Regions:
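Family-specific signature for flavin-dependent thymidylate synthase
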Residues: 1-187
Length: 187
């Protein structure tokens, strides 16, 4: 699940890309309490306050729906941190293009992390085709001009290596991937 903020960013890519997402326009999100915690809030002690604010937004949404306001109008109350399901279909060329742009250190951390995870998966499917997907700084030089971050990612770093360097808080704990059993789900 991704945040609605990620959805707003990634859907800027329109050529040879298709998206299917849950919709605030048609679906009733009353009772939803599932939010992405921004990376820079992790470990700050501010997580509970952030989640409280997100929850408050969704309670306002729910009250509007109960009062007869349509889902679309009530959706303006929804937090950008609300988790959202998103399916993306793209040509290999577009995946490479999106990854090059979106794993750049100038992007939001959630966008970078999600695109690095997608890059990991694409490499596992076809390493030859997707091994050179890194940001422009890894493949010759930054194209941001005076807007450069000044922190080039070394060539030959894998997406897994970049995650370890740039997202250490997410590497500190074991995160169960879909399909893996935890102690509560084994017989």
């Amino acid at each position: 699940y991704l945040s609605r903020r990620f959805l707003a960013q990634i859907t800027r890519h329109q050529n040879e890309v298709k998206y299917m997402s849950a919709s605030l326009q048609y679906s009733d999100y009353s009772g939803v309490e599932d939010f992405v915690i921004p990376y820079d809030l992790m470990g700050t002690g501010q997580e509970k306050e952030y989640l409280k604010q997100c929850s408050s937004s969704m309670k306002n949404y729910e009250e509007l729906v109960k009062a007869g306001v349509d889902n679309n109008s009530a959706g303006y109350c929804a937090s950008q941190g609300m988790r959202n399901i998103l399916l993306i279909s793209a040509t290999p060329y577009q995946w490479k293009h999106m990854i090059r742009q979106r794993v750049c250190r100038r992007n939001t951390k959630e966008t970078r992390y999600v695109m690095l995870k997608i890059w990991e998966q694409l490499i596992s499917q076809n390493g030859e085709l997707f091994s050179d997907c890194g940001p422009f700084c890894m493949n010759g030089g930054c194209e941001e001009g005076k807007m450069t971050c000044g922190k080039c990612i070394p060539p030959k770093m894998s997406p897994t290596d970049i995650i370890r360097v740039d997202f250490p808080k997410l590497c500190e704990e074991t995160i169960l991937e879909e399909g893996e059993a935890d102690e509560d789900s084994t017989d």
